[in-house]
């Protein structure tokens, strides 16, 4: 990964905005280096208002509009949070073995969460996705407990701080940040 020249895409399986952003990125033919945003720098966590019910209601309304625009069915109730680093660890081992399968797993994980309402932190869901894409599910499940992979995911907070990434999807090209799925067409015009 070359943070000076590669197109980087920070994502998290928790975010419906990341799902829409990644879909738009792929639809426009962009090929970013995907980086999980599953360990969030402390200073960002302290600044986030997690419990604002009005904001949560608005975000769900907004996501529904965006999903409708993309002709994607959004479940009525998005599953509760899970241990996000573990899910991203499963993705990481698949992506490290095969970039195409990593992308396929990513899209199926988003689909499972936002279209089917499944808990993607559940190992049975991970196993099903792996079986669907032809990847050894045992490797993915073992990755969820792998200390080295977890340390790698934690190390990404250094890059997030350096590039001032604060949410997903964030795409970074030549150190210029593009936050949000609506910035992707403009980014495409620059590349």
What feature does the model see in each segment?
Residues 17-113:
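Structural alpha/beta surface segment adjacent to cysteine/selenocysteine redox centers
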């Amino acid at each position: 990964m070359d943070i000076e020249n590669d197109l980087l895409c920070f994502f998290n399986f928790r975010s419906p905005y990341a799902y829409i952003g990644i879909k738009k990125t792929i639809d426009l033919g962009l090929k970013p280096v995907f980086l999980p945003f599953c360990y969030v720098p402390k200073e960002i966590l302290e600044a986030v208002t997690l419990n604002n019910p009005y904001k949560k209601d608005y975000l769900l309304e907004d996501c529904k509009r965006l999903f409708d625009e993309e002709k994607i069915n959004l479940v009525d109730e998005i599953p509760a949070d899970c241990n996000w680093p573990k899910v991203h660890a499963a993705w990481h081992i698949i992506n490290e073995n095969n970039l195409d399968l990593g992308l396929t797993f990513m899209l199926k994980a988003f689909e499972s969460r936002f279209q089917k309402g499944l808990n993607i932190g559940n190992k049975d869901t991970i196993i099903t996705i792996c079986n669907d894409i032809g990847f050894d599910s045992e490797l993915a499940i073992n990755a969820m407990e792998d200390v080295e992979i977890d340390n790698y995911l934690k190390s990404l907070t250094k890059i997030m701080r350096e590039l001032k990434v604060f949410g997903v999807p964030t795409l970074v090209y030549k150190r210029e940040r593009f936050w949000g799925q609506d910035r992707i067409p403009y980014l495409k015009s620059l590349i």
